[in-house]
């Protein structure tokens, strides 16, 4: 990264501009989500900033600018006060659609940031009908677990329902038909336990999700820390009567907020 000070209004020195480069070494376009930590002069983390760089072409490098006028650390923000906490990348044609757009399918599929307590992990999946026609589905999302290189992860049993996941509730019942009119949403979810015993712990950074068999895939980044359990529970689609699933964040990753039909965080 490189940094340059830019003049503010009236010629005053404004907040420093930090520029960063994103290089895609892959053979297809990727969309990157980068989380930056902004620090004060003592190196203490003050705030995090998340930026999405869409559709970086194969073998290409793009330069972007990180501007944070509300920098809380005092003084001038420069590259020495910025750290990269996390980088996620997904194929651009499988990236979650931002709230400002609607895919050709008329369905926007996203994952929220989830919740964790006493070894139990849950991540909500949200399906919004952002199109102009009614959409019906029944059953479970179709999942494919992927490693950091987007290759399939084997050896994990995907359970239909969460009865087999201790403390996950397991009260969702069998699948039933869901009808979504334009503007309505459905919610599903992933549940697992971060238990590590004998054997090698497994972490799954990415999950390719289809709302149902044959639907367009969307790759989300829930970072499943499965430990040595070898199991992941998936809940059936239910209509989101709270309306909380409407309008996810710009990067397509919702934020914990109102409770959905499974008592999990829903995007706001």
Indicate where each model-derived feature is located.
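Short acidic, flexible loop segments centered on an aromatic residue
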Residues: 27-44, 137-153, 157-161
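Asparagine-centered strand-capping/turn motif at beta-strand->loop junctions
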Residues: 21-26, 125-131
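Intrinsically disordered, low-complexity Pro/Gly/Ser/Thr-rich segments with frequent PxxP/GP/PP motifs
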Residues: 43-74, 160-195
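Ordered, small/hydrophobic-rich secondary-structure cores
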Residues: 1-63
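Short, solvent-exposed loop/turn segments enriched in Ser/Thr/Gly
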Residues: 12-19, 117-124, 203
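Terminal connector regions
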Residues: 49-50, 63-65, 69-108, 193-238, ...
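Short beta-strands and strand-coil junctions in structured, solvent-facing domains, enriched
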Residues: 131-134, 195-197
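A structural motif detector for short, solvent-exposed N-terminal "entry" segments of globular domains
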Residues: 98-124, 128
